[in-house]
Amino acid sequence: MQAVEITAFGPPEGLKIGERPMPQAGKGELLIRVSASGINRPDVIQRKGHYAPPPGASDIPGLEVAGVVESGDAEAMAQAGIKIGDRVCALIAGGGYAQFCVAPVVQCLPVPKGFSDIEAASLPETFFTVWSNVFDRGRLQAGEVLLIQGGSSGIGVTAIQLAKAFGATVIVTAGSDDKCQN
């Protein structure tokens, strides 16, 4: 399969298309035919040589993807209600800038109705981060107050939107007066 490889750390010119072996989905994973990938700050930092992939993760950049499920762990997919052929978006540890990638089933979401794959590929990192921390761990409820520090970031903006949608009162900080005004 084709994948984006970092051939030289630094500017985008160090990214080249190369050939890589097809990844294989293991227990609790699925294989996605990638149609869109997000670009995140960690991807840029990795390209510049300042962020190593986690141990065992692909060295191919790309942490957010959208595409079609090709295969996977049938039991894990059934528990998640995911079938072969479904459109999903996923948060992965690396490997998203390729024709295919492997994702943990628990880090996949169905592509929302009306969303293109390009739009869906922008969702996983911010939405998983906010949902996991604010709602799963923090158990935010309607009527409660949530302080969001760094409210002008992608994760901050997502936290504001979700907290308000679920009926919380939101207080926000940002790093500068300019960020607070915009």
What are these regions (language model features)?
Residues 12-18, 50-51, 92, 128-133:
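Short gly/ser/thr-rich secondary-structure transition/capping motifs
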